[in-house]
Amino acid sequence: MRPIQNAGGEETIRARSYPVAKATAITAGQVVQLSGGKVVPAAAAQTAAILGIAGEDHSGTADILNPRADGDEILVCDNPGLIFECPVPTIRAASGSAATLVPASGNIAAGAADDAYNAAVLVLKSKAAGSSNSDKPGTRRAVTDYAKSGTVLTLETGGTPAAGDEYEFYPALGSAVCALNPKATALVVSATGAAAVRCIGHDYERHTIRCIAAAHTLAAKS
């Protein structure tokens, strides 16, 4: 994840030091949380509040060139209104029609509920060899319905997806239905559960999605 600005519009990114166990491995750009009063990586299915985005590497092993690599503090970009971005996840089609797409096995979370991906946007990235899909790369198609049974995405009418056609998958704005990847550095649609991270922006030119904390350790609570 790359911090880009704060929700108020200011681009100055604040980072503060927090305690971390000397042996804990964290990379810059990783989503982190507090556990036992110390910074640890966020879980793939992060539902508890996050602290922010790690602002530096902390390998957890001694490094003569970087005394902080196994130090007892780490910098975290911790503004509750921090907006951060990651590469957009991609899926491949297994089959489809002029108004539907069935993703390849494992590309979409099998446990995602009906309508979980409604209002998402698919952008054709590339076509498989021999594909008869009439859409051109870059074509955007909104998801109008999602059915868990068969993992069927209903789309705005367009070309027929062929097996192997690759699409960028932009989650619906305001949704928190994805999961974090194993390194907690990006969102994936192959799993669900990271309810603490919400998608709030699509950058089709840079092929990224923008996110914000849906639950933050420093956010005011009523």
What are the functions of these language-model segments?
Residues 1-222:
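Surface-exposed, low-hydrophobicity beta-strand/loop segments enriched in small/polar/acidic residues
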